[in-house]
Amino acid sequence: MKHLNLILIILILSCCPLHPVYAFLDKDIRLLTMKDGLADNTIPCIYKDEDGFMWFGTDNGLSRYDGKTIQNFKPANTYVSIAAIVRLSDDFLGIVSDGYLYYFNRKRETFLPIHTESDTAIGVFNVLPADDSSFWGISGNRLILCQWEIQQGKEEEKTAVRVRIQKTFQLLEEKGEVFSSLCYHEKAGSGIWLTTNRGNLILFHPDTPGAYQKIPLTDGKTLQVTSILNRDGVVWVSTIGKGIVRYHTKSGHMDRISYGGTGKENLLSHTDVYQTIFIGNNRYLAVTWGGYTLLMPDEKQPEELTSEIYNNTHTQIYRNLETRMISACYDPNGLLWIGTNGGGVMYSCLLYTSDA
């Protein structure tokens, strides 16, 4: 493990001097593609584990990068598109694919079979870890709390995961309304934020499940949500076609960041936003179908945002870069990782010297 950390430190240092001033992908950019060993060049999700490994969920399995080499894994000998990667415990990653959750033992580098009470797979489209033996999941119009444990077999290959639904919550009354994403409230123990395909934002309190709060984000029209983030009193809802919808938790005010708006505070690189992440220094980054956008508070009006759009198709080193960006992950050490639709993974250091 020390060897891995050393490799990643060298990667960071070779990428950029550690000074807290931000640069972006115009010049210093690296690429990982199938030529480097990726399972596929379309990357719907990215995750960094506590040991420093980078995990890329691709359209054809799971890829792990240690800063030097790439190793690929699949739960079966079939074409598997991975939608999400989450930490379930020290040893296990949860891999969401085609509406089902797979367990991957990252220490033993293998997928484990799953057993349920009814021997029927539990369908989930998104997962939120509760602790090292349970998780929240959204399954259609249900919010479920599941508990899991390892069942040790007499032989290692017979070891499996036992999963059971502990609680089920029916929060949606409208026919055809289903959940689309979820995240924790930024204040620990304050609840779970959920979004629906009918444009509703819901704050659910596990201790008082009947007292949930519903906030309409649209006028009843459908809303395709790709991700949700709650930080610094704002819920960021990334969408397809509607840009980013923001809900301010203290005031109840809502605003929208969109493509083609007037003024710096209302501009994105594209209306299809796949993920918005926090990158430090009060800045956020949105990856879209047409590049990415840096969002930051306006100097004169901090409650408003200014934006900088990056959609260059080439740098000093690479030509015809893929600008259809669909996932992102920021390493606090300074590395930004962006997954694309067909162009592999881009990564770059966001730090540079102010003297440069």
Describe these PLM feature segments:
Residues 1-356:
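Carboxylate-rich, polar loop motifs that coordinate divalent cations or form catalytic acidic clusters
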